[in-house]
UniProtKB/Swiss-Prot annotation:
NCBIfam families: PRK00136.1. Transmembrane segments: none annotated. The gene is rpsH. Keywords: Ribonucleoprotein, Ribosomal protein, RNA-binding, rRNA-binding. Belongs to the universal ribosomal protein uS8 family. Part of the 30S ribosomal subunit. Contacts proteins S5 and S12. Disulfide bonds: none annotated. This is Small ribosomal subunit protein uS8. It comes from the Bacteria. SUPFAM superfamilies: Ribosomal protein S8. GO terms for molecular function: rRNA binding; structural constituent of ribosome.
Length: 130
């Protein structure tokens, strides 16, 4: 069976892994998933990530906890295959009044809403993380 929305699957694996207090979660890898994982690591939502395997690469995310609680309180898919959501540089949303991030796919790569605003770029809103 083919997967319809691999990014939603990635976010669900992170959500479920933290709900079950797992140390790490693995999933099939792609360039977009690695780019999203890189943003999550830079923003401190996950500990680390690595890609293993040549023929079927697997992405392993090491989840992050603070005082026994998951760092990621909520992670929500916004733009999906059936309904893409694009925003211009002036329309980029602030998640939880700036406490969370929106992961945005721009022409210059995947970045946070803050970085996209500073670069003067809009793009596809992939997900909200808080």
């Amino acid at each position: 069976m083919s997967m319809q929305d691999p990014i939603a699957d990635m976010l669900t694996r992170i959500r479920n892994g933290q709900a079950a207090n797992k140390a790490a979660v693995t999933m099939p890898s792609s360039k977009l998933k690695v780019a999203i994982a890189n943003v999550l690591k830079e923003e401190g939502f996950i500990e680390d990530f690595k890609v293993e395997g040549d023929t079927k690469p697997e992405l392993e995310l090491t989840l992050k906890y603070f005082q026994g609680k998951a760092v990621v309180e909520s992670i929500q898919r916004v733009s999906r295959p059936g309904l893409r959501i694009y925003k211009g540089k002036d329309e980029l949303p602030k998640v939880m009044a700036g406490l969370g991030i929106a992961v945005v796919s721009t022409s210059k790569g995947v970045m946070t809403d803050r970085a996209a605003r500073q670069a003067g770029l809009g793009g596809e809103i992939i997900c909200y993380v808080a």
